[in-house]
Swiss-Prot record:
Species for this entry: Eremothecium gossypii (strain ATCC 10895 / CBS 109.51 / FGSC 9923 / NRRL Y-1056)
Name the UniProt record assigns to this protein: Inheritance of peroxisomes protein 2
GO BP annotation list: peroxisome inheritance
Residue positions the entry lists as glycosylated: 269, 503, 549
Cellular-component GO terms for this entry: peroxisomal membrane
Location (main, coarse): membrane
Length: 652
C-alpha cells in the first residue's frame, strides 16, 4: 500500500465513493487557515482529476522508484527491507488486540522472556547491531530528510530515524466539517459538490489517521518491550562474563604471586573490571528506579505484591536498597540491580486494564514509595507513557552494552602459573566458626520479625505480642549459648606413664589413694608418703582428703576412673575459688552427713565393705597395680582415712 500525491485519489472504478468532474475554482480557498492545513499535506494536489476515489482499498504507486523510497526500516533486522504496506499490516495485527487481549499478549511477552527467572535472562541474545538506514538510492549526500505524505500521516525519514507524524486530528476536522455543511445548506451553487467531496475526504483521512495511530501505539509498545527484553539479555550476559572474570582474578592473583613469577595480566585489570561493573550496575539501577516511579502509577498495587510473591522478590531487601545509602560492593550492586529489574517487570505485569480505576492501595508499596499516587489515564496516554519508558530503558541498555563491548579485550584468557609445580599448594579449607550456627539462627529470626513488621498494616496487640515473643526467645537463646560450655566426655591426655584409667564404675566413687603392691620401680616413691597418725583431728583428716581429691601435681600417683577426670565447668571452679578453707570444710561435712544420714548400717558390716573396696588389686589379680578394679556404688563405701593409713603401714 503506497501513497503518492496523485496516487491518493487514484484507484479502480466501481467503488462506493466517486468524485465527479467539477470546476477547479474554489478548491483551496475554503481551507485556508483551517485545521485541515495545506491540501498537499494530505497528498491532494489535483482537484480536476476524474479518476474515482477509492475508499478502504489498497492504492498502487504511480512511480516505480517509490518502492525504494518507502522501505520502512525498524529496529529489528528481521524487518529490514520490509515495505510500508507490510509494516502497516503488522501494525493493524498488533493493534487489533484491544483491551484484555493486548494485556495478555503484553504479559505473555514478559513472562516468556525468562527475565523473572532466578538465574536471570537465559533467552538467546539477538544479533541486532542498530537501526538500519533508510534505503533510498535516489537521495543524494546532501539530503538528510525525506518527506512524503500518506493517508496515515506525513512520513519523515532520515538516515537513522523514521517518523510517521499525525497531520489531521479527528475532532477539529469533524467540527470544522459540521460548520461547513451547515453553511452549504444555504448555498445553491454548482461548486457545492466539490466542497462536499473535499470535506468527506478530510473526514476519511482523519478517521484513517486516528484509527492507525491508536493501533500504532500498541504496536510500538510491543516492539519497545521486545527491544528492552533482548537488550536486557545481552547486557546481563556481558556483565556475567565480566563478573566471572573479576572473580577469577580475585582468586588466582594471590596464588600466582606466591609462585615467585610475575603475573601475566596487567596490574590495573582487576580495578578496571570492578569499575566497569560498578558503572553499569549504577547506571542501570538509577535509570530503572526513575522509570519505576513513573510506571507505578499505572499498576494495581495489590496485583504487584501478588506477582512479587510469585517471582520471589524480597520486599524487605528492596526496601533496604531503596532507602539506604551505605557503601555497597560490586556483588551487592549487581544483586540490587537484579532485584529492581524483577520488581520493574512485576510492575509491567500488574498494569491494569485501561477502563479500570484502582481504588485500593497496598501498604507494602506505600512503604516502598511513600509518594505513590494512582492516576487515571486514557488508553492512548497510558500506552504512550509505557512505550516511551520502555524505549528509554532500551536506549540506556544499548549504551551500557556498547561500553562493555568496547572493553571485551579484558575478558581474554590470561595464562598464569597456577599449574606449575611451585604452585601446587591447595587453598586451606575454611573453618566454620563455632558461633556460625548461632549467628545464622539469629539472623533468620530477625529477618522473620522484619518481614512481619514490613507487611503489617497496623500496630495491633497481635503484632506487639509476636515481636516480644521473638525477642524474648532470642535473648534466652543467647543467654543459654553463652553460659553453656562444651565438656569433654573423654579423659584428658596424661603425660605420666604410670597413670592409667579403667572405666568400670557406674556409681558414686571418690578418688582413693592406693599403693602399688609389686612394682619395684614405684618403691622409692612410696617411701615419700608420710603416715598420718590416727590421733589427728577430724578436720585435718578431711583437709588431707580434700587435697588428695583436688590436687593435680604430677608427682602423685592417683588411680581413678575416667568419669572422675572430667573437667569441671568454669563457673564451679570460680565458685570454689571464692570460698575459704573453713567454708570448704563445712561444705564437705554437709555432703558427708547428707550421704550417711539416711542409712546407718552396722559398724562391722560397713568396715568389711570398705576393706573390700581397698583390696581390689588382690581380688582382680592385681594387674601389677596399674589398673583399678570396680568400685561399689553403695553409700557405705565411703573411705575412712585412718584405716587407709593403717593398711599402708602394714604393707610396708
Amino acid at each position: 500500500m503506497y501513497y503518492t500525491p496523485k496516487g491518493l485519489l487514484s484507484g479502480r472504478p466501481g467503488q462506493t465513493m466517486v468524485r465527479e468532474s467539477e470546476s477547479a475554482t474554489g478548491g483551496e480557498g475554503i481551507y485556508a487557515g483551517s485545521p485541515l492545513g495545506n491540501a498537499l499535506d494530505w497528498g491532494i494536489d489535483v482537484y480536476t482529476d476524474r479518476s474515482p476515489t477509492v475508499v478502504n482499498d489498497d492504492f498502487e504507486p504511480l512511480d516505480s522508484t517509490m518502492d525504494e523510497l518507502f522501505l520502512f526500516p525498524t529496529c529489528r533486522d528481521s524487518y529490514s527491507g520490509t515495505p510500508m504496506g507490510e509494516l502497516i499490516r503488522r501494525v493493524f495485527e498488533h493493534g487489533a488486540l484491544g483491551g484484555e487481549h493486548f494485556l495478555e499478549e503484553f504479559q505473555y511477552t514478559i513472562i516468556t522472556s525468562k527475565g523473572l527467572n532466578v538465574n536471570g535472562m537465559t533467552a538467546p541474545v539477538s544479533s541486532v547491531t542498530g537501526i538500519s538506514e533508510l534505503n533510498n538510492q535516489n537521495a543524494g549526500p546532501g539530503k538528510t530528510m525525506v518527506h512524503a505524505p500518506t493517508k496515515y500521516g506525513r512520513l519523515v525519514g532520515s538516515r537513522k530515524v523514521l517518523y510517521l507524524r499525525k497531520t489531521v486530528s479527528f475532532l477539529p476536522v469533524a467540527l470544522f466539517c459540521v460548520r461547513c455543511f451547515r453553511r452549504l445548506l444555504l448555498v445553491r451553487s454548482k461548486s457545492r459538490k466539490n466542497i462536499i467531496v473535499a470535506l468527506l475526504v478530510a473526514i476519511y483521512l482523519a478517521l484513517q489517521q486516528e484509527n492507525f495511530h491508536s493501533r500504532y501505539v500498541r504496536h510500538a509498545t510491543m516492539m519497545n518491550l521486545g527491544k528492552m527484553l533482548n537488550s536486557w539479555s545481552d547486557v546481563e550476559a556481558r556483565m556475567h562474563r565480566y563478573h566471572i572474570r573479576l572473580k577469577e582474578l580475585t582468586i588466582y592473583r594471590p596464588i600466582t604471586l606466591t609462585g615467585g613469577k610475575p603475573p601475566t595480566y596487567p596490574t590495573n585489570n582487576h580495578s578496571l573490571l570492578a569499575d566497569l561493573l560498578n558503572m553499569a550496575s549504577d547506571m542501570l539501577y538509577y535509570k530503572i528506579k526513575h522509570i519505576v516511579t513513573e510506571l507505578l502509577s499505572l499498576a494495581d498495587t495489590e496485583n504487584l505484591v501478588h506477582y512479587c510473591g510469585i517471582y520471589d522478590v524480597n520486599m524487605v531487601t528492596l526496601y533496604g536498597y531503596l532507602h539506604t545509602t551505605s557503601d555497597l560492593g560490586t556483588a551487592d550492586k549487581i544483586n540490587r540491580l537484579q532485584l529492581l529489574k524483577k520488581f520493574s517487570l512485576c510492575i509491567l505485569l500488574s498494569i491494569t486494564r485501561f477502563d479500570r480505576i484502582v481504588t485500593t492501595r497496598s501498604a507494602v508499596v506505600l512503604k516502598l514509595f511513600p509518594n505513590y499516587k494512582h492516576r487515571y489515564m486514557k488508553e492512548t496516554e497510558k500506552l504512550l507513557l509505557l512505550s516511551k519508558a520502555l524505549g528509554d530503558v532500551a536506549d540506556c541498555l544499548n549504551e551500557v552494552s556498547k561500553v562493555l563491548e568496547s572493553y571485551k579485550s579484558q575478558l581474554k584468557y590470561i595464562e598464569t602459573s597456577i599449574n606449575d609445580q611451585h604452585n601446587n599448594v591447595l587453598p586451606q579449607p575454611v573453618m566454620i566458626e563455632s558461633g556460625l550456627e548461632r549467628v545464622t539462627v539469629t539472623l533468620n529470626e530477625l529477618n522473620e520479625i522484619q518481614n512481619k513488621l514490613f507487611h503489617a498494616e497496623s500496630d495491633d496487640e497481635t503484632l506487639r505480642k509476636f515481636v516480644q515473643e521473638k525477642l524474648h526467645e532470642l535473648c534466652h537463646f543467647w543467654e543459654h549459648t553463652t553460659t553453656k560450655k562444651p565438656t569433654s566426655l573423654l579423659p584428658p591426655q596424661v603425660t605420666s606413664p604410670h597413670r592409667q584409667f579403667h572405666n568400670t564404675s557406674n556409681g558414686f566413687v571418690l578418688n582413693v589413694v592406693k599403693a602399688i603392691e609389686t612394682n619395684p620401680a614405684m618403691a622409692p616413691q612410696l617411701t615419700s608418703y608420710e603416715p598420718v597418725t590416727p590421733a589427728g583431728s577430724e578436720s585435718c583428716l578431711e583437709q588431707d582428703f580434700l587435697e588428695s581429691n583436688f590436687s593435680t601435681e604430677s608427682g602423685e600417683h592417683i588411680y581413678s576412673t575416667a568419669d572422675e577426670e572430667t573437667v569441671a565447668p568454669q563457673y564451679l571452679v570460680d565458685r570454689f575459688d571464692k570460698l575459704s578453707h573453713e567454708e570448704l570444710r563445712l561444705r564437705l561435712d554437709e555432703q558427708f552427713k547428707r550421704l550417711t544420714v539416711d542409712t546407718k548400717p552396722p559398724k562391722q558390716h560397713s568396715k568389711k565393705d570398705r576393706l573390700e573396696v581397698l583390696n581390689m588389686n588382690v581380688r582382680d589379680g592385681s594387674n601389677n597395680g596399674y589398673e583399678s578394679g570396680p568400685f561399689y556404688s553403695k553409700e557405705e563405701s565411703i573411705p575412712v582415712l585412718y584405716e587407709l593409713n593403717q593398711l599402708l603401714s602394714n604393707r610396708r
